[in-house]
């Protein structure tokens, strides 16, 4: 399934099926929380959180593709992410976009 952040797919006509979403919520583990507390003191990347967000984004895209496929879509255009914290130890990531179905182009032979 093609997923793109652009509005158009060059050379492809399609009909819009509607909006589609992929959502995931992940909790931070105790070790990541402890490591984050230490990093707050000395600064630097919190690799446990980075890994969690990377995994969450991929899971959200996978779920977006599943929903689009269930709608009969061939692709998703204008894909975007949104994310936010829930309480102090959970992260929610949403991938959303527009599900589209390709329209077959009819090739007309020139008259001779």
From Swiss-Prot:
<protein>
    <recommendedName>
        <fullName>UPF0145 protein LAF_1635</fullName>
    </recommendedName>
</protein>
<comment type="similarity">
    <text>Belongs to the UPF0145 family.</text>
</comment>
<dbReference type="Pfam" id="PF01906">
    <property type="entry name" value="YbjQ_1"/>
</dbReference>
<dbReference type="InterPro" id="IPR035439">
    <property type="entry name" value="UPF0145_dom_sf"/>
</dbReference>
<dbReference type="InterPro" id="IPR002765">
    <property type="entry name" value="UPF0145_YbjQ-like"/>
</dbReference>
